[in-house]
Amino acid sequence: MAIIEPTAALIEPTANKKVIVGMSGGVDSSVSAYLLLKQGYQVEGLFMKNWEEDDTDEYCAAADDLKDAQAVCDKLGIKLHTVNFASEYWDNVFEYFLAEYKAGRTPNPDIICNKEIKFKAFLEFADDILDADYIAMGHYVRRSDDSGQSQMLRGIDGNKDQSYFLYTLSHEQVSRSLFPVGELEKSEVREIAKEMGLITHDKKDSTGICFIGERKFTDFLSTFLPAQPGNIETAEGEVIGTHQGLMYHTLGQRKGLGIGGMKNSNDDPWYVVDKEMDRNVLVVGQGGNHPRLMSTGFYADQLHWVDRIGPDNGAKITVKTRYRQRDVACSLHYDGEDRVKVLFDEPVAAVTPGQSAVFYDAEVCLGGGIIDSLIRE
C-alpha cells in the first residue's frame, strides 16, 4: 500500500531549515518526524521528562516512552536529545493544578502544560541549545499563513482536533511551529507508521493526566490536598448523602455519587448541578437538563488571543467549553481589559468554572480564557 502524503497546505520545506520534534514515544510524534524528513527538513528529536516518578512508579512510564522514542529515531536515522523539565512542570503546571482544585474549580493541566512547557520551555531549549528554526509536535491542528500572520486551524480529523488545548499559543509561537499530522486522519497516521515499520504504529494513545496515569484520581489528589467531607443536597435543600471533598466532583458528573435508589425520586440519574463552596455542599439534581445545570452564558478571564487582539466586541462566533464538545453559537462582549461576557444562543449544560472556553471563527482558533462564573437567567 502506498504511503499517504500530507496535503500541500503544510509549510513550504527548506532543506537547510532545522526542526526539533517533540518525541513523546507515541505514534503522532513518530509520524511527524517521518513526514518532516520526507519534506526535506533537517530533523532532530527532543524527549521531555516532565514528571519525577520514583523507581517503583508504573504510572508515567517515562522510561518506556523514552525507549520507544529512541527506537523510532534510530529507525529514521535522526538524533534524539533529552531534557528534564520536571522543575518547570511542578512550578508552572502542577502547583496551578492543585491551587485550582483547592478552590473548588476544575482545571485542565494539559492546556497549561502546552503553554508553559511544550511551547515555552521546549521552544526556548530548542532555540538556545539546539539552534532550531522550527519546533514540531504531534498535535492535530493546522497552521495557515494565508492572512499574512500565522493562524491556528482545527485539525482535519474532527475527532482528534486538539486546538482546544493549544489556544494559549500566540501567532509568533504558531509561526515557529509545524504540525504535520494535523493534515491527516488518525487512521492515516497509524497507516504511515505501520508502513514505515515504526514501533509505535499500534501503541495505545495516552489518556488522562500524565502525573496521575492509571491511578484513581481521588487517591492521587488526596495525597496532596486534605479531604473536606460535607453534605450532598438536592437542589431543593434535602440532605441525601455525604461527599469526601468538593474537589473530587465536577459539574455534570453522574458517576460515583453513591446516591442511587432514593425514596420519592424518579428513575432519572442524579447529576452534580452545583458546588456551594461557602457551605461545602455538593448540590445534585435529576436529569441531564436539570435547570440548575443549565446556563445561558458565562464570564471568562485570563484571556489569550492568538493574534493578540481578539474578536470585535459583540462578535458572533462559536465556543467550546470542554474538549470534544460541539461548537456552541454565542456572542462575545468585553467586560474590562481581561474579562468577557459570553452569551449562548441556546442554554448549555454543565459549563464548568476553571475549565477553558475556546473561541472559533469557522476553522480558525481565535483563543480563549478561563471560565470564572456562570450566567443563569
UniProtKB/Swiss-Prot annotation:
One Pfam family here: tRNA_Me_trans_M
The enzyme's E.C. designation: 2.8.1.13
Gene Ontology MF terms: ATP binding; tRNA binding; tRNA-uridine 2-sulfurtransferase activity
Gene Ontology biological-process entries: tRNA wobble position uridine thiolation
Keyword field: ATP-binding, Cytoplasm, Disulfide bond, Nucleotide-binding, RNA-binding, Transferase, tRNA processing, tRNA-binding
Region (Interaction with target base in tRNA) residue spans: 108-110
Region: Interaction with tRNA, residue numbers: 160-162, 322-323
Protein's name in the database: tRNA-specific 2-thiouridylase MnmA
Organism in which the protein naturally occurs: Shewanella woodyi (strain ATCC 51908 / MS32)
Upper classification of the organism: Bacteria, Pseudomonadati, Pseudomonadota, Gammaproteobacteria, Alteromonadales
